[in-house]
Structure formats: C-alpha cells, structure tokens
UniProtKB/Swiss-Prot annotation:
Gene3D superfamilies: 3.10.50.40. Residues 59-68, 303-322, 983-994 have a biased composition (Low complexity). Residues 954-964, 1036-1045 have a biased composition (Pro residues). Residues 929-940, 1202-1216 have a biased composition (Acidic residues). Interacts with WIP and actin. Interacts with TBC1D23. This is FK506-binding protein 15. The modification Phosphothreonine is found at residues 1093, 1198. Residues 196-289 form the PPIase FKBP-type domain. Residues 71-168 are annotated as: Important for function in growth cone organization. One of its GO terms (cellular component) is actin cytoskeleton. PANTHER family: FK506-BINDING PROTEIN 15. It comes from Mus musculus. The modification N-acetylmethionine is found at residue 1. It is found in: Cytoplasm; Cell projection, Axon; Early endosome.
Amino acid sequence: MFGAGDEDDTDFLSPSGGAKLASLFGLDQATMGHGNEFFQYTAPKQPKKGQGTAAGNQTAPKPAPATTGTSSVLFATAVHAYRYINGQYAKQGKFGAAVLGNHTSREYRILLYISQQQPVTVATIHLNFELMVRPNNYSTFYDDQRQNWSIMFESEKAAVSFNKQVCVAKCNSISSLDAVLCQDLVAAEGPAVETGDSLEVAYTGWLLQNHVLGQVFDSTANKDKPLRLKLGSGKVVKGLEDGLLGMKKGGKRLIITPSACAAGSEGVIGWTQPTDSILVFEVEVRRVKFARDSGSDGHSVSSRDSAAPSPIPASDSLSADPVVTPLPLPLKPGEPGLRSKSNSLSEQLTVNSNPDTVKAKLISRMAKMGQPMLPILPPQLDSNDSETEDATVLRGAGQSLVTPSIQPSLQPAHPVLPQMASQAPQPSGSGLQTPSAALMQAVSLDSHSAVSGNAQNFQPYAGVQAYAYPQTPSVTSQLQPVRPLYPAPLSQAPHFQGSGDMMSFLMTEARQHNTEIRMAVNKVADKMDHLMTKVEELQKHSSGNSMLLPSMSVTMETSMIMSNIQRIIQENERLKQELLEKSSRIEEQNDKISDLIERNQRYVEQSNLMMEKRNNSLQTATENTQARILHAEQEKAKVTEELAAATAQVSHLQLKMTAHQKKETELQLQLTDNLKETDLLRGHVTRLQADLSELREASEQTQTKFKSEKQSRRQLELKVTSLEEELTDLRAEKTSLEKNLSERKKKSAQERCQAEAEMDEIRKSHQEELDRLRQLLKKARVSTDQAAAEQLTLAQAELQSQWEAKCEQLLASARDEHLQQYREVCAQRDAHQQKLALLQDECLALQAQIAAFTEQKEHMQRLEKTKSQAPAGRAAADPSEKVKKIMNQVFQSLRGEFELEESYDGGTILRTIMHTIKMVTLQLLNHQEEEEEEEEEEEEEKKPLRPSLEQPGPATPGMPPAPPSGETQEAPEVLPEQVVGETTPLPLQALPTPENGAQTRKGEPAEAEVPSEIKDSSLPPQPAGIPAHRVLGPPTSIPPKPPGPVTMDSESEEMLAADQRTVQPNGLLGEEHVREVATDGLLQGNSRRLSLTPDPEKGEPPALDPESQGGEAQPPECKQAEDVSSSGPRETLLDTELASAAAGTSLRHNQDSQHCSLSGDEEDELFKGATLKVPRPTAQPEEEDEDEVSMKGRPPPTPLFGDDDDDDDDDIGWLG
C-alpha cells in the first residue's frame, strides 16, 4: 500500500521463500558422503506379534561348532529370539543369550542357547562385528552362518548390559586398540549431532583393567548438573568428542578410547593421570542445541522432534532471511503418502489468502477503532466477520473450509465524523518517526509508536491454535486481537516427527508461507494505523481552522477523505490482484510438489520391487554359496583336524624317538657300570656265602640256646607268678594284721582312758580323805596333845604310802599290758618285713635274669636281621589270658585294700579302679595285637605287668630327733626318688585332721598326730635299714564333744585322746581332697593347723606343725583347712596306721613324760610299707572362735614335693 509494492515483491521472492528441489529427494546426500540411500541395504523392521506364526514349524539350523576352550560366561540373560526367514522375522522362542570369552586367546562370541547342551547359534565377536540396536529393547546381528537374528530383551537394563559387554569384548578381541570404538546402548530418533552443536550429556568414565571395567575415574553422578559442551571446542578429550558425533537426543552410547586419543591437558574432561590406559565412557545425550537452528529461533535449546513449529520472530527481525538447511534423510519404503498433506496445505493457503477475507478483517478492525473513519456498514459485515472468524477457528482444528467471497459496498452514505477525536489520547512510545509519503511530508508525527508496540507485544502462538495480538486496555489505539490466518492443523503434527526430508521441507515451506502472509498483513495494518494518525492530525488542524472558515474546512475534509478512500480502494484492489497471483503460484507449486511426490513414490515402489527381485535372487545365490561354503568349510575342518592329528602324532613320535634314544644311551652307560659292579659283587657274594655258612652254624647254636633259655624263662615266670600270688596273700595278711593292731590299739586307748578315769576317781576320793583327815588333824591338834598328833601323822603317812603303792601298781599293770601288745604287734611286723625282703630279693634276681634274657634276645634279633633269613612268623602265644589273670590279681589286691564297712565311699573307689583297670587291659591288648608277630614285643609287654618286682629307691636313713618344746615336729618323708610304681593306682582317700585328745603336761604344748597321705600301701616292704616314716605332729586339745575324745584336767600327768576320723571322699579319681579339720584347744585357747613342709635337700620329712622354727605359734587365722587335690591316682590313708600311731604316741608320753614322737626302728618297722605323698595344699578358710593373730613375717607353707610330675609318673609306672 502507498507505493510499497516493491517491498511486497521482494518479501515474497526472497530466498527464504524458495527451497532446493534436490532436498526433496535427498539428492544432495552425496555431499555428505553417504551415497544413494535407495541402493543401500536397510535393516528390516522389528517383528510384530503376528509374524512368528508363519515360520513356527521351521527348524533352526545347527550352529557352527564353537571352540571348546576355557571360555567363561561374561554375561547371560533371557531374550526372545527372531530369525529372518523369507523376508520377515519368525519367532524362534525364548532363549538364553550369553557373551562368552577367553581372555588369554582373545576369543569372544555370542551364544544363543536353549539349555546347556542345546546351543542354537553362535556369532563370533571381532572388531568388525556389528550389533545394531533398535527401539523397544531390540538388537539385531548376523551369526557365523550369515543368518540375521533379532533378539528382544526383557528390560532396558538387560539390553544395556548386554550391549556394553559386547562392546568391551570387541575391544578385548584385538591386541592393541588404535581408534575409537563405539556401541549404541539405547536407540534414539531424530537428527544426529555434528561439530559445532551444543550438548548436555551425562557420562561415567571407567578404566579398562584386566579386560573388564575397572575403577571409575570420573562421573557426572557425583556432580550437581550434567556436562554442557560444544563439539569441536576441545573441552573434552578427543576420543570422547569423536564418539559423540552422530548421537541423537535421548540416546546412550559406550565409547572406548585408546590411550592415543585420551591425551590432553590436565583440565580437560576425561583426562587421567596414567597415559597408557584405555578409557571407557558411557554417555547419554539429554539436550541438544543445533548450530543450524541458532539463526531461526532465540531459544537456547530446541528439540527437533517436537510437534510445534518454531515461534515467529519479532518485528525488528522480519527483514532477516532465515536459511534452513534440513538434514537429508532417506525416505524409507512404506511411509504413508504425502499427497493429502500437500493438498490440505494448498487448500488452506488458497482459502486464507482470499482477498474478501482480508478486506473483511481490515474493515472490522477499522470499525472497532476508537474513532471510525468510515460510515456505519450494513449489518451484513457482522455476519461476514463472524463467518470468517468461525472459519478460521474451524481451520485451526484441522478442517479446510471455503468461505464465500463477500464484497460489501464501501461507498459512504454521508461523511459524518464523530466528535470523539479530541478525546483519543496520544500513544506514548519511543518508536521510529517516519513521515507520511501520501499526505503532508512536512508533518512528522510519532506514528510508529503503536506499530512498534504491536510488534513488540506480539508473542508466539500457543501450540497451533491462535496467533494472538495481546491488547493493553490502557492504550485505546492498539489493534484488537485477530484470529490466526494460517494455523497448522493439529492432525498433521504427528507426521512431522522424524518422517524424513520431505516432511522437514514441507514444514519449512509452510512456515515460510505463514510468515510472508503475516508480514503482508502486518504491513497493511501498519499503513492503516499510520493513515489513522494522519487523519487525526488533520482533524486537529481543521478544528482549529474551522473557526475562520467552517464551510471551507468541511469541503476540504470531505474531498480529502474521498481521495483517501479512493486510494485505499485502489490499493486494496491491487493487493487483491497480487494475492490472487501469489495464491495461483502457490497452487501451481503445490501441484508440482504433489506430482513430484507421486512420481517419487512410483520410483520408490519400482525400486523396491527391483530390490526385492534382486534380494530374492541374491538370497537364492547366497544360500547356494553358503551351502557350498559350509560344505567346503566342513571338509576343510575335517582335513585340518586330520592334519593337526597327524602332525601331533608325528611330533609325539619324534619326541618318543628322542626319549628312547636318550634312554638307550643311558642304559648303555648303566650296563657298563652294572657289568663292573657285577664283577665286584660276585667276589663279594662268594665272601658273603662263606660268612653265611658260618652265621648259619652260629644261628643254629643260638637257636638251641634260645630254646633252652626260653624254657627256663617260662619256668621262672611260673615261679614269679606263684611268688606274686604269695606276695598278694602276704599283703592281705598284713592288712588284716594291721587292722587287728589298730583295733587293739583302740581298745588299749579305751582301757587307758578308763584307767585314767579310775585314777581320777581314786585321786578325788583320796583328796577327800585327806581333807577329812586334815580337818580331823586340826581338831585333834586342838583337842589332843603331841602324842596324838604324832599318831595322826604316822597314820597319814601310812595311808599316803598305801595310796601311792596302789597307784604305782595300777600304772605298772597298765604299762605292762600296753608293752606286751606293742611287742606282739612289732614281732608280727618284723616277720612280715622279713618275708617281704625275701620276696624282693627273689624278684630282683628274676628281674636280672629277665634283663639278661632280653639282651640275649636282642643279640639274636640282630643276628637274624644280618642273615635276612628270619623265620616267616612265629606263633606268638596269646598273652590275653595272662593279662587278664594279672589284672584280676591287681583288682583283688586293690579290693583287699578297702573295706566297704568303713566310712569312706568304697563303691565309688571300686568303680574308678575298675575303669582304670579296664582301660589298662584294653591298651595292653591293642598294643599286643599290633606286634603279635614278633616275640620280642611279648616280652616287652609282660615286663611292665610286674612293677611290684622293681627295686624300691633308698629312703631317708632315720627319724630326726624330736624337736624341743615350741618347735615344729617334723615327720619323716619318703623322697620322690623312693616312690616305686605300684601294681595298681589307688585313688586318694581324703581324711580330716584327727581331733586328738591332748595330753598336756605343765608348761608344755599339746602334741597330736597328723594324718598323711600314704602312697603305695600295697607295695612290697622296703629293705632293712631303710624305714618309711610316719608323719607325726603335736596334738591339739579340743573341748569334749559327744562322741569326741575325753579331755583331762591340765594338772593331770598324762592325757590321751582317741582319734576321731571321718573319711570324706570328695570325688572320683583325680578329684579328691584331703581336708584337715582344725580343733579348738581347751587349755591353750587356740586351734593349731598342721602343714607338711618338705626339705628335699636334707632328705628330712616335712614339718607338720604350723609354728615356725623360733618356737612362735602361728595365728589361728592361718590355721585353715587344706584341700589337697590330686591329678593322678592317689593312695588312701590307712586308719589302722593312724590308730597305731596315736597309741604309740600315748605310750611314749606315759613312759617318758616328755614331748617325743614315734621314731627309731620300732616306728620304721611298723610303717615301712607306706610312703607319704602329699600334693600342694590349698588354703581353705575356716571360722575360728579365738582371737586372730597376724601372720606377718612368716613364710607360707610349702608343698610336700617340688613337682607333681614325678608323682604322676610313679603312679603309672606299673604300666611300663
């Protein structure tokens, strides 16, 4: 309008309105190096659900024989497999897909299998192996038989892991990686990125270590936002940048870069410290900004696969010509036809470019202005306006409607101007000031303020429904919102998504047409607004001049209005013609486009038919060639296997031949050496034969001697068994005699107590008589004279002498009785000791003979070994009966040691002893069965069964003298060397400290016996002169308790207390305790504790008194009960010995009237067979009635023996 036709022509004929025809058919792909896509192989589409039934009955071919190396499973998952048969995919079922690999031989392959014994197909993975990733978790590949397989994974995670493992296997299949290796993990659609495009990616980088993904050296998972980069900027390492080329939005890819492509500075992303490492990146493209789209829109990042067209630029950028270069992609066969699209576009363009509609729009807009210039139009215009608006609304919904061309009459009825012009405010703005070219050039107004405001306020239409001119209510001169002229239909939006170059071309063409028409409409609207401002100015000027020339101004206004209206009408007609011409051009171009599309489809169908024919012929040819190749390969494999077997046999035979040659040379050398040795050995053999004849003679002589000695030895053994039986009988007699002696001692002690009681009664009566006589004497002295006093003194002296004589007679008779009993017991003991000494001498002689026999036997064994002609086996006599006999004897002897009527638990002791005897017999029998073939072992086994024949060790020579008053009384003790292994181990019998009735003289401490643990009670007696001493201690006085001992007055001469012993077995074998119970003293007021303290250096027996050598008494709190625990078999304390010791002590006190203990030959002979073994005592607290004295400065009691190991060894010494 107003001479702006050149601008319209240039706008419509600008380069943005045209496009290359070559881009329609993708002929410019040669410039990108892809070649003609129609003659390239395109992979078939993924199978649909109904395609697997067609080839369900066909059997899958047997896979090529896979190498059975030491391949390991790198990854395995379940897939749905499809095989490409006869132009479509046939479902084969659900298989297992595994990636197998052998890192040493660099052999990797994909295995599809039904089970472990049923492989389906094998595809070897090498550098040129291609695993093509498809949408919906599909992947396709060719196996070793060139069969196309498609597998569908159950999840995207499984597909990504499988594809990743295949890529790593491709990298591991070559020795050195020289180029970047890529593998798509997830398929994506859309244009590929190129150099210069901006990306937003998420990545994770690993080091390839030991053929697997190793340490993660970089990842965006640890960062707040993903990485943004521009390809070609050098922000990342070269290998990663090369691997990103060709990716699409939403795609994932695994990129393996060699060390040569991972070089860069330290700040570059993906750079690592080790320079020789292979880097592995997993990259996901999230957002893309293409460099070719940066000029057409102002957004930072645009998505090319979105359905909405690009927004419209602002008014100041209308003059720029956006050059859009669509990415040429091949038109795949099977795409829907585009004829309907082009028709709908052309119809929309023709309908929307109708000049009637444009004129109706303009008139409606002018009518809606604040001050309308034209007269009121008939009501027909409103209906046209509503019709056009309804039509545009329907077109926005995708319907193409043709509105009728309505030409309303624009002739003005009368030029009446409203009076509202003065009220229109001036629009404020800083727009461009352009003078009007049609009216007055001298007047310059701010006319473009409204236009620029409209242009600036213009916003991109939301979706595809409306191009909106947002209005501001405060500005009255602003244009009203207009319906969109050419909205893109919603139904066509899905066809613009990834449908190739034709779709992109049509989209850009439609956009260009829309922008050009919009620009033309905007220009017309701008010119109308400019005209309106001019008219307003003229109205202002005319209102000022109307005061002078009212008629003239009216005529001037009407003439000017008419001229302007005529110009407007002319311009509208011219614009109508231009629009008609352009719409005709667009229709012609649309017809051409549709013809070209139809022609293109025909060519594509023809090419597809030709390709199918070629494919069929190629498939038949390839099947034939594959059959031949398979046959040839099978033959080749057979031949190669035979050749390998033959070469292996040849090499094996050559190795055998060389080995045989070496053996031959070695054997020849050995033969020469052996010949020399045989010469030497022949001479040696002759000498040995002579020696052998001599040895045979000697062996015959020794055999005769051995037989005679064996017979004599058997006789001696019979004698020994008889002697042992006698010895056991003697021991039983000894025990019975000792019991009798103890009973007699008890009786004598009781008689003595009775005698003492009688003496006390006599003394009391005597004292009463004396008192009575003294009283009489006093009376007589008073009453009588000196003669009577003399008679009385004489009578008193006679009575006293008679009383003393009676007392002496009674004491002498009691002493005589005790001495007679004691002498009888000593005589019996001496007789038993003599018998035992004789038996010991005989046993020693027998042992010497046995030792001589064993030496002779060993000598004979050495002679037989030198001859190497020992007899094959001698029937060794079965010693089980002898062992049973010996063990029965042992048991009888043990049972004789105990009496079930006594207070100790005899049943428990018998059970433990029987258990030990059984264990010993089993050990002996097993030991004898292992070596029953050799007769020497029989002798060695019988030897430990006679421990009673061993010679006892020397004992202490005598009893030390009794210590003075206040010192500890030491008891003799047999040293550990004297303890001889006994025939049977006896358990420990715990006995408390006897509560003795103390005999107390004036100023002397009481003494009592101390029980000691006696070992080897069943042992043969010791030789004469080596006594085994009893342990004696000072007795402690106790208060009279029923049934306790009787205690006498302190002024009496002698006191005797009977031993009250309680046997308390505290457990089984090895867990018994000796408890010593302290007794409370009446006279001294405290209790004494007796402890055993050995002196191994001097050979003295241990002291049994808690007092120190200085004569000081130990405090009562230290006199506590001792628990003596034993770890091995223990001996019982004999009650008879304790009783006899008590009796002996009392007799010795009666005779000597002083402190002494049993010592000398009598006591030694009485207890010669008993050996004392007291283990380490452990202190046990006991309540005391008296005041406690501090034990500071006194050493603790020491154990009887220094070590218990010797005792344990002695206990089991009878086993050998």
